[in-house]
């Protein structure tokens, strides 16, 4: 197995854990604001990455994808009980299990993009990007006001 892939699989769980968000000392308004800012980052990184997926510039794509993974991992932590509001549907807190599955699928699709980048596989990169984008739409259909 390629040494890059081995390192990738060792580092990804560590990186995901290291992106913990400290929201304990924040007001509901601050958490909602951070959540909305984080969603804006996710949208910006995804929009920036889309044209890059066809460029073959894997180092540049990797940089954006790492930022996207960080933002997505952080985003998952920004929905604690009692922070309902903004554009987030109350259904997030009512059906938390499904919401967490959707977010986990989104994060996994970003990790799959990283594997495509490491393999410099343009075809799987585009496929995984489309899966990631589809995961966004699925979650928004169910959970966005």
Q: What positions do the PLM features span?
A:
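The canonical Cys-X-X-Cys-His
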Residues: 132-144
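Sec-dependent N-terminal signal peptides
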Residues: 4-14
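Boundary at the C-terminal end of the N-terminal hydrophobic targeting segment
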Residues: 16-20
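Residue-level signal for mature regions of secreted extracellular proteins and peptides
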Residues: 11, 129-132
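Extracytoplasmic c-type cytochrome modules immediately beyond a signal peptide or single-pass transmembrane anchor
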Residues: 21-129
């Amino acid at each position: 197995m390629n040494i890059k892939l081995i390192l990738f699989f060792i580092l990804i769980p560590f990186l995901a854990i290291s992106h913990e968000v400290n929201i304990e000392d924040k007001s509901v308004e601050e958490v909602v604001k951070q959540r909305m800012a984080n969603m804006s980052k996710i949208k910006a990184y995804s929009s920036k990455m889309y044209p890059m997926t066809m460029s073959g510039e894997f180092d540049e794509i990797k940089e954006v994808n790492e930022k996207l993974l960080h933002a997505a991992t952080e985003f998952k932590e920004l929905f604690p009980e009692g922070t309902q509001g903004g554009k987030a549907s109350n259904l997030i807190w009512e059906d938390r299990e499904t919401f967490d599955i959707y977010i986990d699928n989104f994060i996994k699709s970003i990790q799959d993009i990283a594997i495509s980048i490491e393999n410099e596989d343009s075809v799987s990169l585009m496929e995984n990007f489309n899966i990631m984008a589809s995961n966004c739409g699925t979650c928004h259909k169910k959970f966005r006001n």
